[in-house]
Amino acid sequence: MVEHRLPAKVLAAPLHKHTREDEFSFILEGTVGAKFGDQEVSAGPGNLIFKPRGEWHTFWNAGETPARLLEIISPGGLEELFRRLDRLTEDLSPTEWEQLIAPYGCSADMKATMALVETHGLIF
């Protein structure tokens, strides 16, 4: 379980999917937007967003104030990828990104991510 603090209008991750884990976001403060599959939702404090394995998804702060949420990913193991991402010191190309996340059963769609950023006026 990881607590995320997202400034206003920040996208937490590119549109991605993982094949081994289910992901849950429990909203503590603020408003969080999420996309999973073809559906988009907006959730506030006390709401739980379920993002099942194998489905394209991402989430962002949909409000003008900071948001806080708990991310629960089960089963464990994906946290090693997060540690690697936290140690990055420069931006990755789409190809480098895919090479980094593929061993963890993950893939990302950067084109769809940038469309989402534009649609919602997000920072990524």
Positions of predicted regions on the chain:
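A short glycine-rich, His/Asp/Glu-containing loop-to-beta-strand
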Residues: M1-L15, E21-D22
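A cytosolic small-molecule/anion-sensing beta-strand core signal
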Residues: V2, L28-E29, P45
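Tight coil/turn sites that cap or link beta-strands
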Residues: P7-V10, G46, G54, E64
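Hydrophobic small-molecule pocket/channel-lining residues, especially in calycin-type beta-barrels
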Residues: L11, H18, V32, E80, ...
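Short acidic-glycine-tyrosine-enriched beta hairpin
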Residues: G33, D38-W56
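Ligand-binding loop in jelly-roll beta-barrel domains
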Residues: G33, R53-E79
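Acidic/histidine-enriched, glycine/proline-rich intrinsically disordered or flexible terminal extensions
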Residues: L85-F124
